[in-house]
């Protein structure tokens, strides 16, 4: 089972980059400022948002996600997937004055399962309560050093990184 989970994590990470481009990923560390915080990304409702726009008074929680990763959506009968916790996490963040955004940087499947139309359908089916934006060319993911989905980054009100990692310890 561990081998299957490791393989799935590797596949999800690889889907976040394109084979045509060789891009060195950054590595954000606690205290680092959020790169590209003012970069506009298209939400599933057509609106353009940046992290600055979506931040609450105490910061912003950025969750890299997609419609297809088994760690996000689960694997039938084997694992539950993290996306069923997204709304709970977003609700807790909102109570603390923190904005939340889901970022889809899966360029490899942009014309298929992770297209804007599929993102809209997936968000509706999952009942997302936060913006779900597309990271064209995986620019934000590369700037953050996001390697897998889900990958979580919590920034304070000054856009300094406080946490980077998984959603919880499950």
Q: What would you call each of these model-derived segments?
A:
Residues 1-5:
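Positively charged n-region of N-terminal signal peptides that target proteins for export
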Residues 6-17:
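Bacterial N-terminal signal peptides
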Residues 21-52, 81:
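N-terminal "domain-start" segment that seeds a small globular fold
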Residues 50-79:
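Short active-site neighborhood of thiol/selenol oxidoreductases, capturing the structured segment around
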Residues 57-60, 95-100, 127-131, 149, ...:
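Loop/turn elements at helix/coil->beta-strand transitions in domains of secreted/extracellular proteins
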Residues 73-125, 139-140:
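Structural microenvironment flanking redox-active thiols in thiol-disulfide oxidoreductases
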Residues 119-156, 162:
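Short, internal strand/loop/helix patches
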Residues 160-170:
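Non-catalytic, surface beta->alpha helical segment in thiol-disulfide oxidoreductase systems
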